[in-house]
Protein backbone atom coordinates (compact mmCIF):
# COMPACT_ATOMS: atom_id res chain seq x y z
CA UNK A 1 0.00 0.00 0.00
CA UNK A 2 1.24 3.49 -0.87
CA UNK A 3 2.68 5.37 2.10
CA UNK A 4 0.63 8.55 2.37
CA UNK A 5 -0.78 10.71 5.12
CA UNK A 6 -4.21 9.48 6.18
CA UNK A 7 -6.98 11.42 7.86
CA UNK A 8 -10.50 10.53 8.89
CA UNK A 9 -13.44 12.89 9.24
CA UNK A 10 -15.97 11.23 11.54
CA UNK A 11 -19.42 12.79 11.41
CA UNK A 12 -21.41 12.89 14.64
CA UNK A 13 -23.52 16.03 14.32
CA UNK A 14 -26.82 14.37 13.46
CA UNK A 15 -29.86 13.95 15.70
CA UNK A 16 -31.85 11.22 13.98
CA UNK A 17 -35.56 11.44 14.74
CA UNK A 18 -36.21 7.84 13.70
CA UNK A 19 -34.45 6.53 16.81
CA UNK A 20 -37.23 7.98 19.02
CA UNK A 21 -34.71 8.69 21.78
CA UNK A 22 -33.81 11.81 23.75
CA UNK A 23 -30.17 10.77 23.38
CA UNK A 24 -28.58 11.26 19.94
CA UNK A 25 -27.98 7.90 18.25
CA UNK A 26 -24.19 8.32 18.21
CA UNK A 27 -24.16 8.49 22.03
CA UNK A 28 -26.43 5.51 22.70
CA UNK A 29 -24.62 2.71 24.51
CA UNK A 30 -23.61 -0.31 22.47
CA UNK A 31 -22.06 -3.06 24.59
CA UNK A 32 -21.52 -0.48 27.34
CA UNK A 33 -19.84 2.17 25.18
CA UNK A 34 -21.26 4.96 23.00
CA UNK A 35 -21.84 4.05 19.35
CA UNK A 36 -19.43 6.84 18.37
CA UNK A 37 -16.64 5.33 20.46
CA UNK A 38 -16.76 2.08 18.49
CA UNK A 39 -16.43 4.00 15.21
CA UNK A 40 -13.60 6.21 16.45
CA UNK A 41 -11.70 3.24 17.85
CA UNK A 42 -11.66 1.52 14.45
CA UNK A 43 -9.93 4.54 12.89
CA UNK A 44 -7.64 5.10 15.88
CA UNK A 45 -6.42 1.51 15.53
CA UNK A 46 -6.01 1.81 11.75
CA UNK A 47 -3.08 4.20 11.86
CA UNK A 48 -4.76 7.48 10.99
CA UNK A 49 -2.37 10.42 11.18
CA UNK A 50 -5.25 12.63 12.23
CA UNK A 51 -8.93 12.33 12.98
CA UNK A 52 -11.33 15.26 12.82
CA UNK A 53 -14.49 14.67 14.86
CA UNK A 54 -17.42 16.77 13.67
CA UNK A 55 -20.21 17.10 16.18
CA UNK A 56 -23.10 19.35 17.14
CA UNK A 57 -22.06 22.87 18.06
CA UNK A 58 -23.37 22.42 21.61
CA UNK A 59 -21.63 19.04 22.00
CA UNK A 60 -18.05 20.00 21.13
CA UNK A 61 -16.87 20.31 24.74
CA UNK A 62 -18.72 17.15 25.77
CA UNK A 63 -17.03 15.19 22.99
CA UNK A 64 -13.60 16.57 23.86
CA UNK A 65 -13.88 15.54 27.49
CA UNK A 66 -16.25 12.59 27.62
CA UNK A 67 -15.36 10.92 24.34
CA UNK A 68 -11.86 11.89 23.17
CA UNK A 69 -10.16 12.33 26.56
CA UNK A 70 -12.07 9.65 28.45
CA UNK A 71 -11.34 6.97 25.85
CA UNK A 72 -7.82 8.17 25.04
CA UNK A 73 -8.22 8.85 21.32
CA UNK A 74 -4.83 10.43 20.67
CA UNK A 75 -5.40 10.57 16.90
CA UNK A 76 -8.38 12.91 17.29
CA UNK A 77 -6.63 16.22 16.76
CA UNK A 78 -9.71 18.45 16.54
CA UNK A 79 -13.37 18.43 17.51
CA UNK A 80 -15.20 20.92 15.30
CA UNK A 81 -18.84 22.00 15.12
CA UNK A 82 -20.95 20.64 12.31
CA UNK A 83 -23.66 22.31 10.28
CA UNK A 84 -27.33 21.96 9.51
CA UNK A 85 -26.86 19.35 6.79
CA UNK A 86 -24.40 16.49 6.37
CA UNK A 87 -22.56 18.30 3.58
CA UNK A 88 -22.11 21.33 5.86
CA UNK A 89 -20.45 19.11 8.46
CA UNK A 90 -18.19 17.47 5.88
CA UNK A 91 -17.14 20.88 4.57
CA UNK A 92 -16.30 22.04 8.11
CA UNK A 93 -14.15 18.94 8.56
CA UNK A 94 -12.38 19.45 5.24
CA UNK A 95 -11.71 23.10 6.07
CA UNK A 96 -10.23 22.05 9.42
CA UNK A 97 -7.87 19.67 7.61
CA UNK A 98 -6.93 22.39 5.12
CA UNK A 99 -6.18 24.87 7.91
CA UNK A 100 -4.02 22.25 9.64
CA UNK A 101 -1.88 21.86 6.51
CA UNK A 102 -2.97 18.36 5.52
CA UNK A 103 -1.17 17.47 2.27
CA UNK A 104 -3.06 17.65 -1.02
CA UNK A 105 -2.00 14.13 -2.00
CA UNK A 106 -3.07 12.68 1.36
CA UNK A 107 -6.04 10.37 1.75
CA UNK A 108 -9.13 11.48 3.66
CA UNK A 109 -11.80 9.02 4.75
CA UNK A 110 -15.26 10.36 5.58
CA UNK A 111 -17.30 8.16 7.90
CA UNK A 112 -20.66 8.24 9.64
CA UNK A 113 -20.17 8.13 13.40
CA UNK A 114 -23.38 6.08 13.58
CA UNK A 115 -21.67 3.15 11.80
CA UNK A 116 -20.01 1.48 14.80
CA UNK A 117 -19.15 -1.86 13.18
CA UNK A 118 -16.67 -0.59 10.62
CA UNK A 119 -13.40 -2.50 10.93
CA UNK A 120 -9.76 -2.26 9.99
CA UNK A 121 -10.15 -4.38 6.87
CA UNK A 122 -12.80 -2.07 5.39
CA UNK A 123 -10.70 0.98 6.27
CA UNK A 124 -7.59 -0.53 4.68
CA UNK A 125 -9.47 -1.33 1.47
CA UNK A 126 -10.81 2.22 1.35
CA UNK A 127 -7.34 3.71 1.77
CA UNK A 128 -5.92 1.38 -0.88
CA UNK A 129 -8.79 2.19 -3.24
CA UNK A 130 -8.28 5.93 -2.87
CA UNK A 131 -4.54 5.52 -3.48
CA UNK A 132 -5.26 3.64 -6.70
CA UNK A 133 -8.35 5.46 -8.02
CA UNK A 134 -8.43 8.81 -6.13
CA UNK A 135 -12.06 8.19 -5.10
CA UNK A 136 -13.77 5.12 -3.67
CA UNK A 137 -16.63 4.10 -1.43
CA UNK A 138 -17.32 1.05 0.69
CA UNK A 139 -20.27 -0.74 -0.89
CA UNK A 140 -22.08 -4.06 -1.08
CA UNK A 141 -24.38 -5.59 -3.72
CA UNK A 142 -28.05 -5.17 -2.85
CA UNK A 143 -29.83 -8.33 -1.75
CA UNK A 144 -33.43 -7.35 -2.38
CA UNK A 145 -35.30 -6.52 -5.56
CA UNK A 146 -35.50 -2.74 -5.93
CA UNK A 147 -38.42 -1.02 -7.65
CA UNK A 148 -38.88 2.56 -8.81
CA UNK A 149 -42.19 4.12 -7.76
CA UNK A 150 -44.19 6.75 -9.59
CA UNK A 151 -45.64 9.85 -7.91
CA UNK A 152 -48.75 7.90 -6.86
CA UNK A 153 -46.88 5.05 -5.20
CA UNK A 154 -47.27 2.49 -7.98
CA UNK A 155 -44.41 0.40 -9.33
CA UNK A 156 -42.96 2.04 -12.41
CA UNK A 157 -39.90 -0.07 -13.21
CA UNK A 158 -37.52 -2.68 -11.82
CA UNK A 159 -33.80 -1.95 -12.26
CA UNK A 160 -31.40 -4.79 -12.95
CA UNK A 161 -30.33 -5.83 -9.45
CA UNK A 162 -26.86 -6.83 -10.65
CA UNK A 163 -26.09 -3.15 -11.25
CA UNK A 164 -27.28 -1.91 -7.85
CA UNK A 165 -25.05 -1.40 -4.82
CA UNK A 166 -25.72 -0.40 -1.25
CA UNK A 167 -23.40 2.51 -0.46
CA UNK A 168 -21.76 2.74 2.95
CA UNK A 169 -18.97 4.69 4.60
CA UNK A 170 -16.07 5.20 4.80
CA UNK A 171 -15.81 7.05 1.50
CA UNK A 172 -12.19 7.82 0.69
CA UNK A 173 -10.55 10.39 -1.57
CA UNK A 174 -7.36 12.21 -2.40
CA UNK A 175 -7.63 15.32 -0.28
CA UNK A 176 -7.17 17.82 -3.11
CA UNK A 177 -9.92 16.10 -5.14
CA UNK A 178 -12.58 16.07 -2.43
CA UNK A 179 -11.68 19.52 -1.09
CA UNK A 180 -11.92 21.16 -4.51
CA UNK A 181 -15.16 19.31 -5.31
CA UNK A 182 -16.75 20.53 -2.08
CA UNK A 183 -15.38 24.02 -2.66
CA UNK A 184 -17.38 24.10 -5.90
CA UNK A 185 -20.67 23.08 -4.29
CA UNK A 186 -20.15 25.79 -1.67
CA UNK A 187 -19.63 28.47 -4.30
CA UNK A 188 -22.20 31.29 -4.20
CA UNK A 189 -25.42 30.23 -5.87
CA UNK A 190 -24.59 26.52 -6.03
CA UNK A 191 -27.52 24.16 -5.36
CA UNK A 192 -26.58 21.65 -2.66
CA UNK A 193 -30.06 20.49 -1.70
CA UNK A 194 -29.88 17.20 -3.62
CA UNK A 195 -26.47 16.09 -2.29
CA UNK A 196 -26.72 12.86 -0.28
CA UNK A 197 -23.12 11.67 0.01
CA UNK A 198 -19.52 12.59 -0.75
CA UNK A 199 -19.20 10.38 -3.82
CA UNK A 200 -22.06 12.33 -5.37
CA UNK A 201 -20.11 15.57 -4.93
CA UNK A 202 -17.15 14.07 -6.80
CA UNK A 203 -19.43 12.66 -9.51
CA UNK A 204 -21.09 16.03 -10.08
CA UNK A 205 -18.10 18.34 -9.77
CA UNK A 206 -15.21 16.37 -11.27
CA UNK A 207 -14.42 13.91 -14.06
CA UNK A 208 -13.13 11.31 -11.59
CA UNK A 209 -15.00 8.01 -11.47
CA UNK A 210 -15.75 6.60 -8.04
CA UNK A 211 -14.61 3.01 -7.44
CA UNK A 212 -16.51 0.55 -5.24
CA UNK A 213 -14.49 -1.36 -2.64
CA UNK A 214 -15.80 -4.17 -0.50
CA UNK A 215 -17.66 -3.04 2.59
CA UNK A 216 -19.61 -5.39 4.84
CA UNK A 217 -23.25 -6.27 5.34
CA UNK A 218 -22.50 -5.84 9.05
CA UNK A 219 -21.35 -2.25 8.53
CA UNK A 220 -24.82 -0.94 9.30
CA UNK A 221 -25.83 2.62 10.10
CA UNK A 222 -27.65 2.83 13.41
CA UNK A 223 -30.83 4.72 12.54
CA UNK A 224 -33.74 2.96 14.25
CA UNK A 225 -34.17 1.06 17.54
CA UNK A 226 -34.10 -2.19 15.56
CA UNK A 227 -30.63 -1.29 14.27
CA UNK A 228 -29.33 -1.10 17.84
CA UNK A 229 -30.58 -4.61 18.52
CA UNK A 230 -28.91 -5.92 15.35
CA UNK A 231 -25.65 -4.12 16.16
CA UNK A 232 -25.63 -5.58 19.70
CA UNK A 233 -26.04 -9.10 18.31
CA UNK A 234 -23.33 -8.64 15.66
CA UNK A 235 -20.93 -7.16 18.18
CA UNK A 236 -21.63 -9.91 20.70
CA UNK A 237 -21.02 -12.62 18.12
CA UNK A 238 -17.94 -10.88 16.80
CA UNK A 239 -19.46 -10.81 13.31
CA UNK A 240 -18.24 -7.35 12.39
CA UNK A 241 -17.36 -8.44 8.87
CA UNK A 242 -19.83 -10.18 6.60
CA UNK A 243 -18.53 -9.83 3.06
CA UNK A 244 -19.59 -10.76 -0.47
Located regions from the model:
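Short helix-capping segments at alpha-helix termini
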Residues: 46-47, 69-75, 101
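Residue-level signal for inorganic ion chemistry
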Residues: 10, 36, 93, 112, ...
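Short, flexible, basic/aromatic active-site loop/helix in glycosyltransferases
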Residues: 148-173
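Conserved donor nucleotide-binding strand/loop of the catalytic core
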Residues: 72-84
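N-terminal glycine-rich phosphate-binding loop and ensuing alpha1 helix
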Residues: 2-63
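Short acidic/polar active-site loop segments enriched in Thr and Asp
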Residues: 49, 106, 208
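Conserved alpha/beta core of the MobA/IspD/sugar-nucleotide pyrophosphorylase nucleotidyltransferase superfamily
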Residues: 2, 165-244
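Conserved beta-loop-beta/alpha segment of the NTase-like Rossmann-fold superfamily
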Residues: 84-149, 168
Amino acid sequence: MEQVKKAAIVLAAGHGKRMHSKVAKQYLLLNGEPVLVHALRAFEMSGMDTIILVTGADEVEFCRKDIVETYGFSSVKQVVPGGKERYDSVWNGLCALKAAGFPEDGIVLIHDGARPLVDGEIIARAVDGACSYSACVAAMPVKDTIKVADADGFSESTPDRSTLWQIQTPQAFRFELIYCAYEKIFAPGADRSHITDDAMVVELMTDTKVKFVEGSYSNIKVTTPEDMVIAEVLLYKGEKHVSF
